[in-house]
A protein has these predicted regions:
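SAM-dependent transferase fold signal centered on methyltransferase-like domains
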Residues: 1-201
Length: 201
């Protein structure tokens, strides 16, 4: 696939009706399925995640992940909450410098156990010195790794189940998770035990 040609094609047809576009003939070196998915994603995210939708270097996953990801407004709000927590930790450390177990250097580590599209991870990472994105789906990990580089975010991507990662994880400052509340068929889950990962365990 010719990436530059594909990107130009997407930008030209960004506002097209994707159903009609899917019936049209595509150049041989452009992946029709990939292009349709990217155009659909940008149209869906135009209001929900404007800064990502407008960045033509970013790549997007299947529709279910788009529907489940946080909006830009929500992700920024979560970032504000974690920023306030950082200020509290900094204040507590400065008030008790003689207590040896308090690390006044405050190298803060965040682990997002439900990485998904990486929206929350990306915004939350601004308040941490080290950020680890954990996701069980390999395709989402590949897309997240690409997008984090585009966004100039220094985030480590780990392809693993949340439970497996936690079993070998060292000490961190913040663990974030937003479990999937829909199954692979898009059906809404009600019980916490049905969510992935099972946060009730």
């Amino acid at each position: 696939m010719n990436y530059e040609l594909t990107k130009d094609f997407i930008n030209v047809h960004l506002n097209d009706d994707v159903n009609k576009l899917a019936l049209s003939k595509f150049p041989d070196d452009i992946d029709k399925q990939f292009v349709i998915r990217q155009i659909q994603a940008r149209q869906l995210l135009k209001k929900k995640l404007p800064s990502w939708s407008e960045n033509d270097e970013l790549l997007f996953p299947k529709r279910l992940s788009l529907e489940q990801c946080s909006s830009e407004l929500t992700a920024k709000y979560k970032r504000t909450i974690s920023q306030n927590d950082a200020k509290t930790q900094s204040r507590d450390a400065s008030m008790a410098p003689a207590i040896k177990h308090i690390d006044t250097s405050l190298h803060r580590i965040l682990v997002d156990l439900t990485g998904g599209m990486g929206v929350d991870t990306s915004f939350l990472s601004d308040n941490f010195d080290e950020t680890i994105y954990v996701e069980s789906q390999a395709e989402l990990c590949e897309l997240a790794e690409h997008n984090f580089k585009v966004l100039k975010k220094n985030i480590k991507v780990v392809n693993a189940k949340a439970e497996d990662f936690l079993a070998q994880c060292g000490e961190v400052d913040c663990i974030y998770l937003d479990p999937a509340r829909r199954d692979e068929y898009g059906r809404k889950m009600v019980s916490l035990h049905d969510c992935s990962p099972d946060v009730a365990e």
